[in-house]
Amino acid sequence: MIWICAYRDWALDIYDDVLENFDNVNLIKSQEEFTNTIDSFTASDSILFIGWSWIIPTVIVEKFNCICMHPSPLPKYRGGSPLQNQIINGERLSAVTFFRMTGKLDAGNILWQKAFPLSGNLKDINFQIKTLCFSGIFDILNNNYKEHKQDEAQSSYFKRRTPEMSEISIDDIKLYTAEDLHDKIRCLQDPYPNAFIVCSDGKKLYLKLADYEK
């Protein structure tokens, strides 16, 4: 049995692709559904987490074959908001990484990893992720991968971004380049908390799309 744990639109597209190509595929879309389904898992099942936001109890990941997709070149950029943190930090290359889940966040053995450029808007980036995700799932379910440990010496961890961190202040405009600010705006497009500036009346002006002079 294959279980796909996903709820974001782009992740549901991946579920559809898997459903078309494999038998016995099931979808779990919420934490409540996951909790209610645990008793149905068996040791031979593959449980894949794609764009999943909820913490899975250690007892579950140690008992079952739980595999997670993380959009970063693990062991770098473990933790929350990986795409946003990479783009805001000026990274130009990321990766789709599938790893075996353990009790430690994003630290399990890597099963599959492929690089992709962090260019374009979030729609462009998510399209690349979707394409690579299906390739990774196809390889993993067909046992076409080489498992290896993560290099802890190369690891980095970032916290999930909060809506308040999306602000672009006057100081930011003076300090950062047009490309820097463009990166912040493009990585915070819907459905994420958009970049914004606070105007003289105290209201927020949201910046959903931007371009800059090359």
Briefly describe each language-model feature range.
Residues M1-K214:
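One-carbon transfer enzymes
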